[in-house]
UniProtKB/Swiss-Prot annotation:
Pathway the protein acts in: Fermentation; pyruvate fermentation to lactate; (S)-lactate from pyruvate: step 1/1
Residue positions of the active site: 181 (proton acceptor)
Taxonomic placement: Bacteria, Bacillati, Bacillota, Bacilli, Lactobacillales
Organism: Streptococcus equinus (Streptococcus bovis)
Name recorded for this polypeptide: L-lactate dehydrogenase
Description of how the protein assembles with itself and partners: Homotetramer.
Entry binding sites for beta-D-fructose 1,6-bisphosphate: 159, 174
InterPro entries cross-referenced by the UniProt entry: L-lactate/malate_DH (IPR001557), L-lactate_DH (IPR011304), L-lactate_DH_AS (IPR018177), Lactate/malate_DH_C (IPR022383), Lactate/malate_DH_N (IPR001236), Lactate_DH/Glyco_Ohase_4_C (IPR015955), NAD(P)-bd_dom_sf (IPR036291)
Phosphotyrosine: residues carrying this PTM: 226
UniProtKB keywords: Allosteric enzyme, Cytoplasm, NAD, Oxidoreductase, Phosphoprotein
Main location: cytoplasm
Documented EC number(s): 1.1.1.27
Amino acid sequence: MTATKQHKKVILVGDGAVGSSYAFALVNQGIAQELGIIEIPQLFNKAVGDAEDLSHALAFTSPKKIYAAKYEDCADADLVVITAGAPQKPGETRLDLVGKNLAINKSIVTEVVKSGFKGIFLVAANPVDVLTYSTWKFSGFPKERVIGSGTSLDSARFRQALAEKLDVDARSVHAYIMGEHGDSEFAVWSHANVAGVNLESYLKDVQNVEEAELVELFEGVRDAAYSIINKKGATFYGIAVALARITKAILNDENAVLPLSVFQEGQYANVTDCYIGQPAIVGAHGIVRPVNIPLNDAEQQKMEASAKELKAIIDEAFSKEEFASACKN
């Protein structure tokens, strides 16, 4: 995709709760000029119905071609977004989904690549860091053109939680969650700030917040998905808008800094050969470069521990015969 191309085409693979919410976000925000929705054959009519339903909103937003797509429609797409996979159930961790979703991911990526697709993959299916890695392996694409949603939603939750605690606009809070999109993620407290003022200094000047309150706040962010899943069965609105934001950055060649699942080549000491959440510059050609925030010793240890856990899952998954050949690529 070139920065000057005017007609932007997105193919969505997976029309479940996350996928359909993402499609709705694209329509609402006027992102892309063409949206194709791919579903498995037995759910093809769901994609047809959603495309028709979404098209009825176009008179209120902006022109867009929306349709139920097939894999051959990926050939000239700028972006393929993968949300398809088994959903996380109450009591399950995201990493519990590996066995179910790796085979699904392989079949999807194989079909997309077979179409002649030359664009960018954006992965949101869980466990997103593992499935972003598998998308890279199965596709043979350059690492810059395979991106995961990573900790984009976690960071948004973190900013919102801090904003509520401090009674300020979340857009004025700048803070990141890094590591796995899951239980081993961590807050980068050392670089959190409000309007450029270091969070620690801001808290001293503005209000007295105990450390225990901040620990509880982070735990609420980390466990937010479990809380929502127990209440309503799934999370989809937040991640849908996060995906729309990433999509906009790619299609508009923004060179925006967003927390994404990014390939690691030693940016953080011993963290290599995996995808994991960190800030990165993203534009029309995918990841321009990672933004390597200097971590303190405690944060560095958490980053390495998170990567170690992901690597163990990846190594175990790709030791199986049906996936082992991808690791030789």
